[in-house]
Amino acid sequence: MKLCVIIIASLMVASVSGRLRKIKGTELDKKMLLEKLGHGMDIRFEETPRACSKKAGEKCKSNCDCCGYSTLCGYITEGKEVKYQCMSKTSNNKILNTVGLGVNAIENMLSFCFR
């Protein structure tokens, strides 16, 4: 019984590795063909410099509009109206404000601004 399980497992491993090798071979063939034709498969993303134009308190549409490492585009509700503006202060408490500025800086860093 154990021998049967070992044989079946080894056949499955051999089958999977053979299929993976075949898939890898076809990918290499496609890549070599594209290189011969002069087309590479490399895709490069480049982040352009941020074009921040808004200071804290001005209207904004996204985090990329606001200048400052911890300045984000947040919203304020006035009645039923929602206004978006650049803001960096998160709390009146000094400790909570420092933590909030750190969180804002991380969130601002994660907003990739591609233009």
Curated annotation (Swiss-Prot):
Disulfide cysteine pairs (residue numbers): 52-67, 60-73, 64-113, 66-86
Keywords per UniProt: Disulfide bond, Ion channel impairing toxin, Knottin, Secreted, Signal, Toxin
GO molecular function terms noted in the UniProt entry: ion channel regulator activity; toxin activity
Highest taxon listed in the record's lineage: Eukaryota
Localization in the cell: Secreted
Primary location class: secreted
GO cellular component labels: extracellular region
Coiled coil feature spans: none
Tissue-by-tissue expression: Expressed by the venom gland.
Family: Belongs to the neurotoxin 03 (Tx2) family. 02 subfamily.
Domain notes: The presence of a 'disulfide through disulfide knot' structurally defines this protein as a knottin.
Role: Probable ion channel inhibitor.
Protein name: U31-theraphotoxin-Cg1a
Organism the protein comes from: Chilobrachys guangxiensis
